[in-house]
Swiss-Prot record:
Family the entry assigns: To acrosomal proteins SP-10.
Chain positions carrying an annotated carbohydrate: 342
GO cellular component, as recorded: acrosomal vesicle
CDD domains (UniProt xref): TFP_LU_ECD_SP10_like (cd23628)
Pfam families: UPAR_LY6
Leader sequence segment: 1-8
Tissue: Testis.
Matching InterPro entries: Acrosomal_SP-10-like, LY6_UPA_recep-like
Stated name of the protein: Sperm acrosomal protein FSA-ACR.1
Keywords attached to this entry: Cytoplasmic vesicle, Glycoprotein, Repeat, Signal
Amino acid sequence: MKEVYLVGYARGASGQSDEPPGSMDHQASVQRLSGEYFSLGNPSDGEALYETAAGENTLSEHTSGEHTSVEHASAEHSSTEHTSGEHASGEHTSGERATGEHTSSEHATSEHTSGEQPSGEQPSGEKSSGEQPSGEKSSGEQPSGEKSLGEQPSGEQSSGEKSSAEQTSGEQAVAEKPSGEHAVAEKPSGEQAVAERPSGEQAVAEKPLGEQAVAERPSGEQASIEKASSEQASAEQASAEQASSEQASGEKPLGEQPSGIPPSSTFSGPILNCHTCSYMNDQGKCLRGEGVCSTQNSQQCMLKKIFEGGKLQFMVQGCENMCPSMNLFSHGTRMQIICCRNQSFCNKI
């Protein structure tokens, strides 16, 4: 403060001031510019410092104006490159564009910081003018940063291509997966071949039909359809064999010959001696084949009456396993069956 006061006093006393002596702005600017950096030895040095500082202040303002225009141009250039960067990143994913915008915002922040640094150093005119080339150098180095920004989409593009390549390989793996599933789907066909083997052992005639059905069907549907068909064929075969076994052990053709073991559902009575006759006239007289049969197990004595043209022709009597009372018709011939339970002779005309 004392030095500034001496400078103002020297200017007022000598009368060599270029500006009005009552101007406080210049004194304040002299206080800001020279208060912290210089120590005045005499009033003449203060006057020279004032003139030099005023000139350098003007130079600094001009320099800061040029620097502002440079920053404005560089900002426009960065916005242009930012647009091109966004256009380049627009061709790629949205995540890459966000990364490019974040990088450009950081770059703009670095420009703002570099722009503020020379203005903060402006109070020392020589130092700001000396540091201005470094600021320009930093602004000149900005295209390298922008170049790295411009190069970033290419790196991102390579990463995008890598991700697309990985996606393609993933799709290829997915495409290959159904083939694996197809192999798995073909496995039940092998199991089904094992499942078809017992049915082939049960019925040899059905096995070529099953193989033909396997050859005609697609490989994808072969597992479930053939398995169901094999199970159905085995179930039908089992039912057919059961029916054939029941038929074999069931009703016999109506003849005179005795049969073997009857089913357990028939009537089981006491053992009787039944009179047999292979041919008996309408009067009940046995003409041939007369004899005696024992009703073992569930056998019964049965009489058959044969009618032709509504007239009784002959009768047959014997021991039979099953004896339902019924009437049978065949080509004008009627046969009446009469069961004689617990009777040795059932010749009842």
